Amino acid sequence: MQTFSTKAQLRAALLKHHRKHDHVVLVPTMGALHAGHRALLEQARKLAGEDGVVVASIFVNPIQFNNSSDLQTYPRTPEKDLEVCEGAGVDYVFSPAPEEMYSGERSIAVEESFLSATLCGASRPGHFSGVCTVLAKLFNLVQPTDAIFGKKDYQQLAIIRRMVRDLDFPVRIHGAEIVRHGNGLAYSSRNARLTPEQKEQAVVIRQAMLQARDEFQAGADASKVKEHAAAMIEGVPGTRIDYLEIVDAETMQPVAENRKPALMAAAVYFGDVRLIDNIEL
């Protein structure tokens, strides 16, 4: 496994693979890698095959944070990250500094104006512009044949697919299932900031969503399903719901009636730690 910190190094290493038309599979991450990331990397290794290459980027992207304290406290575990990458069969790790990725005079950004109008896009202004901009840069740098993203960030996955479609990036986007702890809590880099008590409390998100799916499939109105889920979450001390919505799983627009494809998505604070999760209804 080789590690690069500059764009020039990465491009030079990938040149021979592009000339041979090898499979190049990209897994973009912000580090603090956990079992969910490991599953993405292992899926990438299978997809690339023996002759292809897997590229993992590790970059805490400053322009997708709308809260400076969130950026400063975001977990960073560089040594462990490299161990996870090597164990999963990654060929190249790209870990640039912010000044390597962005010029101080940066004036171009990629915006998405429809799918990002709800959920995380509404509660975190500018977030998805930052995501789309860094991914556009990574797609240009790596020129992957394939890229893999987790479904925990369901809205992000939908936006990435739209960006690839609308801007004609020649890359296949793959969505990977959410990896969970035995109690149902979704793996997240932010889990490291939870207290032991909060980790137990955070299971309520999954419990509320499983109840919501049962109610929705039984024919309950979306508004009632959402009301019951919110009550379950708010019944846990110290929680604060950022958003809890039932949306069309393709357009990310809120739905009031019982129809499919539908998705329940939530962002919930436990203390000052914000966790997201979703479930297809």
Curated annotation (Swiss-Prot):
One of its GO terms (cellular component) is cytosol. GO terms for molecular function: ATP binding; pantoate-beta-alanine ligase activity. InterPro entries: Cyt_trans-like, Pantoate_ligase, Pantoate_ligase_C, Rossmann-like_a/b/a_fold. Gene3D superfamilies: HUPs, Pantoate-beta-alanine ligase, C-terminal domain. Keywords: ATP-binding, Cytoplasm, Ligase, Nucleotide-binding, Pantothenate biosynthesis. It catalyses: (R)-pantoate + beta-alanine + ATP = (R)-pantothenate + AMP + diphosphate + H(+). The active site is at H37 (proton donor). SUPFAM superfamilies: Nucleotidylyl transferase. Pathway: Cofactor biosynthesis; (R)-pantothenate biosynthesis; (R)-pantothenate from (R)-pantoate and beta-alanine: step 1/1. Coiled coil: none annotated. Beta-alanine binds at Q64. It comes from the Bacteria. It holds the Pfam family Pantoate_ligase. (R)-pantoate binds at Q64, Q156. Belongs to the pantothenate synthetase family. The reaction proceeds by a bi uni uni bi ping pong mechanism. PANTHER family: CYTIDYLATE KINASE/PANTOATE-BETA-ALANINE LIGASE, PANTOATE--BETA-ALANINE LIGASE. This is Pantothenate synthetase. It comes from Akkermansia muciniphila (strain ATCC BAA-835 / DSM 22959 / JCM 33894 / BCRC 81048 / CCUG 64013 / CIP 107961 / Muc). The gene is panC.
